[in-house]
């Protein structure tokens, strides 16, 4: 465990943080390949860098330049301000491995949004690209085309900001700004879109940076930045109006009274963390665009527990928080092999604005300490437990000490009061758990 990194980032109890990559130039979003191989030289994930590069990272954590100089204008590194836009959204087409990326470009002195599809022969270097959609007005100061995702229906969903200058366009059905767009992979309009011959899936958004699909309800969730308040999370449904510019709370399931710079989000839904975190939502709060030190505004990752139908938040906890003194902030997040990964846009560069110092960090569960026997808290093990619905299941699966299987009298479990023999447990022999707890005698018998 790297003590220096833990001085910079506080993490939720039971987890650790590791720096996987450093020296990236303003890394924004990251996306993992669908089924990574075990070969060191094969691609594991891709990362967009704000000022026009895409990096491919292989299983051995070497960094390769997949594409570079995709912007046709010179960015100015102004944070906050006109340096906040560029190349942001990233999505991998699972069958072909092609990348969809969103960015702004300059044409006749005006900034516009475009969506590109890039192709590669080996996954390490782009060999061709095509424009899927373009000509959507934008500016250099954020509120551009942001995250891209592919739904369970195989369609492409694209977050488009309102362009900042005229927020009323978010309500204009003839303008693609301030919308979530739905399209076929070639950019054409699906026949079953809410409005015939229109790419608009939902409207009323301001600066919808992040997007993720939840398996349990097969719905799209987005993160949308408010003006100086009401940064929100919303479950996006076909044909709905999400209120902006009149309100950021319309059809939202969560909003923050103060602006937190909400960016990316992802659900824990593939057993990257212990089962107790299943279906929880993890949201990056970036904070100020170049804010030094911990601050009270953002610079953390929040975990939220949603209700089953995605209409409300049942719990809210800080999961990761920056505690250093520089401008580091979490930006993109994604679950991948063995944990949650996030990009740190600025890193620890202490005011050197042009220095490539961005990082990728990994948060993983501390499953086992030396000398400790642990029963992994997975859905499979929980389903095999001798006491379905046991109130001590979390303790049984998480806190294994001295060969004891049970939670040692911390609740009113009747089996514990009697002394629960691990030999009776259907998973006990698998993990060599042989102890029993005899509460009456107050001693352990092996």
Say what each PLM segment does.
Residues 111-150:
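Asp-box/WD-like beta-propeller blade repeats and closely related beta-sheet repeat scaffolds
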Residues 67-71, 131-137, 318-323:
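Short loop/turn motifs that cap or connect beta-strands within the blades
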Residues 2-11, 36-40, 48, 74-80, ...:
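Beta-propeller domain segments
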Residues 19-52:
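Beta-strand-rich domains and repeat architectures in extracellular enzymes and scaffolds
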Residues 369-446:
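Cysteine-centered metal-binding/redox modules
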